[in-house]
């Protein structure tokens, strides 16, 4: 049985779909009263709980072999954010502790490329660059770095865990519309008539889901893996969208 936290999120619901397609048993952890549209039609178990509730996590992990921890809050705003830090750091600490108590076979934690130390533009980012909870900008960035370090420190205490760090995730089933998903939608609807300089490494959400499963199956305990796609300029991305919708 696989427990997926953050199961209705963009990566989470695609991961659940991929696990189901492979015949894997899935238990999805949802917030109380959370909408289930992203998981509609899937043969899964649903339990309600919160990563800030240790008792709920222990109940959710009963009989679970693998935990995919994706639950968290995303913010692109600079500065501190107490709720982001609490959910992403304390929530992950709780998941780690519950995983160790439940004796799960493996924890797969979804971190972020933004948790990795910033380097000059000419340097290629790879897994040799450390996580940096201090020198990076937003509350989200630092919270993901701190949470990742918590997971890796738990490995030294006996937890079997691996970490994945996706880059810019795009693709289908973006029910809540991420920042990039909203930009893509607005561009397709001709609501955005301008472009901006710059580029980013984008990765298909379906590849991320498969990467998570590969990390579970083949990843080495205590290692982290960057899930990357292709560097695309924003202007190229927007031009491609306009071309496909006939604008």
Descriptions of predicted regions:
Residues 2-22:
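N-terminal Rossmann NAD(P)H-binding glycine-rich loop of SDR-like oxidoreductase domains
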Residues 34-40, 44-90, 98:
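NAD(P)H-binding glycine-rich loop region in Rossmannoid oxidoreductase-like domains
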Residues 90-140:
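Conserved Rossmann-fold NAD(P)-dependent oxidoreductase catalytic core, especially the SDR/UDP-sugar
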Residues 111, 149-172:
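Conserved beta-loop-beta element that borders a ligand/cofactor-binding pocket
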Residues 131-135, 182-207:
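A conserved pocket-lining segment of Rossmann-fold NAD(P)-dependent short-chain dehydrogenase/reductase
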Residues 171-182, 215-225:
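Glycine/proline-rich active-site loop of Rossmann-fold NAD(P)-dependent oxidoreductases
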Residues 211-247:
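Mid/C-terminal beta-alpha module of Rossmann-like enzyme folds, strongest
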């Amino acid at each position: 049985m696989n427990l997926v936290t953050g199961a209705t999120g963009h990566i989470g619901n695609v991961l659940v779909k991929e696990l189901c397609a492979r015949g894997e048993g899935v238990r999805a952890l949802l917030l109380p009263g959370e909408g289930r549209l992203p998981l509609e039609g899937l043969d899964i178990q649903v339990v309600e709980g919160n990563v800030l509730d240790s008792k709920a996590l222990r109940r959710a992990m009963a009989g679970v072999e693998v935990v995919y921890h994706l639950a968290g809050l995303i913010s692109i705003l600079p500065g501190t954010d107490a709720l982001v830090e609490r959910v992403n750091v304390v929530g992950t600490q709780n998941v780690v502790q519950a995983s160790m108590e439940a004796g799960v076979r493996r924890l797969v934690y979804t971190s972020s490329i933004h948790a990795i130390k910033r380097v000059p533009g000419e340097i290629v980012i790879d897994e040799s660059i450390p996580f940096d909870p201090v020198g990076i900008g937003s509350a989200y960035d630092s919270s993901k770095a701190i949470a990742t370090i918590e997971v890796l420190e738990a490995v030294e205490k006996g937890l079997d865990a691996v970490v994945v760090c996706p880059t810019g995730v795009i693709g289908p089933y973006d029910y809540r519309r991420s920042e990039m998903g909203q930009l893509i939608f607005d561009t397709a609807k001709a609501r955005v008539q301008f472009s901006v300089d710059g580029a980013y490494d984008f990765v298909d959400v379906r590849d991320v889901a498969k990467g998570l499963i590969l990390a579970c199956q083949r990843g080495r305990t205590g290692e982290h893996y960057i899930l990357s796609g292709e560097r695309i300029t924003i202007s190229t991305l927007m031009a491609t969208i306009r071309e496909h919708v006939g604008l």
